[in-house]
Amino acid sequence: MKRFVLGCLALLGLVVALGAGAHTTVEKTKPATDAPLDSSPPTIEIQFKHAVQMTSVVVLDAAKSERKLTFTPATSAALITINEPALQPGRNEIRWKGLSKDGHVISGTLIFAVKQSSANP
């Protein structure tokens, strides 16, 4: 009986450990987060380790103005594309929220700095 109980506890520990691994992480972004940008990119890509169901993406610009951004796909995927972010000169925070495949809420922030345009006199 003691072996049975120990076996069940070991199996439970394995199941809990596997469940914890169901949360996903960002593997890379394009452009790279914290990269200085000459201008706003046409899209921003977020590559996750596992598929996520993105629920919202907003940008907070240097003036602290927040606006919703569109993204694709609307279904669960490991690669999320943010369409036409129209980043403003200065610091921009892309704040995203989604659901991992185990149903837990995940979120993060990407920082991009867009150079100020120089006007020619």
PLM region descriptions:
Residues 26, 36, 45-114:
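Acidic, low-complexity Ser/Thr/Gly/Pro-rich repeat segments typical of extracellular/periplasmic
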Residues 21-40:
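N-terminal edge beta-strand
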Residues 1-8:
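Bacterial N-terminal signal peptides that target proteins for export
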Residues 17-19:
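N-terminal signal peptide c-region/cleavage motif recognized by signal peptidases
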Residues 115-121:
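Low-complexity, Pro/Ser/Thr- and charge-rich linker/hinge segments at domain boundaries
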Residues 11-12:
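Repetitive helical segments and hydrophobic/amphipathic motifs
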